[in-house]
């Protein structure tokens, strides 16, 4: 085709090609496609148009390589088909997902099914082997994953490396982490980092162990230090954190930025529904003054090269024809999207709805904890008052220690909404025998009611927080009856719920419907006094042992920095 000796299978005419190699944008030209690849670019050769050649007139619009989200979490909340309807339809042709949530929820059985769903998804879904399931087995319980099962996932052809491994496990020489790294290095696969808080000698040790990336830069200085050590810098902008404004200026004017990427780390629901996964990130990069072709490279060529996805990530001869035609380089709205040269979407909609991937009935029976009556949430103490240790929120993801004096009634320590002190519980979801720990939480603002969810990071155990034992029981039993999800209760009523029956963490519903139910839960909590804009993010992270300082697990209250259990009653 390039030599003008054969017709193209498809032809895109008058397209401005965004070149991610030299960061130039061409004048309107033609792009010939054949056998799922880009065959030629330039003035149209007479032979390119054959009797069966499909022709698309771009009319001066911009042709980009398909976008690649190099770090996200597609193993909870929604299925991959519904995600594709919003991501692929806007030009996001590939995603690299962590699997830690599914591993914690359902172990190897869930991972095998999720990989089967990924193989059948409309867009390309690559995965990362979950490294530490759970991260700290001495503190917490999850479904678990043996080293043999880890190696099975790592060897999968669509698995590109080891998922984010917390830096203390690496520099402290944790045996599981070292074995995982060695297995991946033997296969030539990447080692994804989670270097939050690591600097200087610790960060160097983390890199020296073989870690290849970090998505935890929260400042320009963080990004510069990681780049200087040879780490790929993945800049987050999504549901959990938004760091482009702080970090992008450090990357914008570098002579060479091949180690830079923009990632969602899980796309914000509203952004995903309105504009797509990486599209809002490209728009923000443009607003921050990044040259459009450079920003596109951060979301295409750079991830492809980093993960060794040869012949992906560019509009160039021989490259896979995963392409998006966008109307402008400010909002990056996609008119057409191709996957391997086949048109898949037009004006933000897939041409064919994705075929539903149906999980077996066992998927909805993974929450195995026993019934949780009100008395399960009673914490015994003598006398009429008790002084307790309290986990206080210090932002969405960090906690600190506080103390409170609480009333004891009939031998049970009560919550005190007047002091903004709730009772909380962390229940092992994997045991038919009741295994749980109780504690107290501050920073929720609830005046009445309770919330419950098992969508907590890494372990996916059941977290409950509330003003009374009866309301905690109602919220927890609602989640248990749904097989997983979110619930808000007050008095004797369930005010809102979001069922997540697949592995206890995924809904089969369309993403907008999942978002609607999550918003119902947020509004219900707001009506009960909770002022948080994202209360369930706080719920997800409140028991997360990967960040400081005080965390409640199913085994007890943990001081993460001191690396020991501490007493609730003082």
State what each model feature region is.
Residues 1-29, 33-39, 44, 90, ...:
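Active-site microenvironment of metallo-dependent hydrolases
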Residues 43-44, 99-102, 130-131, 167, ...:
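Short, ordered loop/turn segments at secondary-structure junctions
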Residues 44-49, 53-117, 470:
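Metal-associated gating/positioning segment near the N- to mid-region
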Residues 64-70, 97-100, 128, 163-165, ...:
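Active-site neighborhood of phospho(di)ester-bond hydrolases with catalytic His/Asp-centered motifs
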Residues 106-110, 136-142, 173-178, 202-206, ...:
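Short acidic, glycine/serine/threonine-rich loops at helix termini
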Residues 144-163, 169-235, 242-262, 273-287, ...:
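Histidine/acidic residue-rich metal-binding segments in metalloenzymes
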């Amino acid at each position: 085709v390039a030599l003008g000796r054969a017709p193209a299978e498809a032809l895109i005419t008058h397209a401005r090609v965004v070149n991610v190699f030299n960061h130039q944008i061409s004048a309107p030209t033609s792009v010939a496609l054949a056998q799922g690849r880009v065959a030629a670019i330039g003035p149209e050769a007479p032979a390119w148009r054959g009797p069966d050649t499909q022709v698309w007139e771009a009319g001066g619009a911009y042709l980009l390589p398909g976008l690649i989200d190099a770090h996200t979490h597609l193993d909870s909340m929604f299925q991959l088909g519904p995600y594709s309807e919003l991501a692929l339809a806007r030009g996001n042709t590939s995603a690299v997902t962590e699997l830690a949530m599914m591993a914690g929820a359902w172990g190897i059985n869930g991972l095998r099914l999720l990989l089967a769903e990924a193989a059948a998804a409309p867009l390309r879904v690559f995965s990362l082997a979950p490294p530490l399931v759970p991260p700290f087995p001495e503190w917490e319980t999850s479904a678990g994953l043996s080293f043999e099962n880890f190696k099975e996932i790592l060897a999968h052809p669509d698995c590109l490396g080891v998922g984010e491994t917390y830096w203390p496990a690496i520099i402290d020489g944790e045996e599981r982490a070292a074995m995982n790294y060695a297995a991946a290095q033997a296969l030539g696969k990447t080692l994804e980092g989670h270097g939050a808080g690591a600097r200087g000698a610790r960060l160097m040790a983390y890199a020296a162990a073989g870690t290849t990336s970090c998505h935890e830069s929260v400042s320009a200085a963080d990004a510069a230090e990681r780049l200087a050590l040879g780490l790929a810098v993945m800049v987050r902008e999504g549901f959990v954190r938004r760091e482009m404004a702080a970090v992008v200026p450090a990357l914008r004017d570098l002579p060479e930025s091949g180690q830079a990427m923009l990632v969602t780390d899980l796309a914000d629901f509203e952004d995903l529904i309105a504009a797509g996964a990486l599209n809002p990130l490209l728009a923000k990069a443009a607003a921050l003054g990044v040259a459009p072709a450079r920003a596109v490279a951060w979301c295409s060529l750079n991830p492809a090269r980093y993960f060794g996805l040869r012949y992906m990530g560019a509009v160039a001869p021989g490259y896979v024809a995963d392409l998006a035609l966008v109307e402008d380089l400010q909002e990056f709205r996609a008119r057409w999207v191709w996957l391997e040269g086949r048109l898949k979407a037009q004006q933000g909609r897939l041409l064919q709805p994705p075929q539903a991937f149906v999980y077996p009935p066992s998927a909805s029976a993974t929450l195995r904890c026993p019934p949780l009556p009100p008395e399960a949430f009673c914490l015994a103490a003598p006398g009429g008052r008790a002084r307790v240790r309290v986990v206080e929120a210090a932002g969405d993801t960090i906690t600190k220690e506080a103390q409170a004096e609480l009333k004891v009634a009939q031998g049970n320590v009560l919550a005190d909404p007047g002091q903004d002190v709730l009772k909380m519980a962390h229940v092992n979801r994997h045991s038919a025998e009741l295994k749980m720990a109780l504690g107290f939480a501050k920073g929720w603002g609830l005046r009445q009611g309770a919330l419950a969810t098992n969508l907590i990071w890494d372990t996916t155990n059941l977290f409950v927080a509330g003003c009374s034992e009866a309301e905690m029981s109602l919220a927890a039993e609602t989640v248990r009856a749904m097989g997983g999800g979110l619930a808000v209760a007050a008095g004797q009523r369930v005010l809102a719920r979001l069922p997540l029956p697949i592995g206890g963490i995924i809904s089969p519903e369309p993403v907008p419907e999942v978002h609607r139910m999550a918003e119902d839960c947020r509004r219900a909590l707001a009506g009960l006094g909770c002022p948080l804009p994202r209360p369930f993010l706080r719920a997800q992270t409140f028991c997360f042992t990967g960040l400081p300082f005080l965390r409640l697990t199913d085994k007890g209250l943990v001081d993460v920095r001191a690396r020991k259990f501490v007493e609730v009653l003082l």
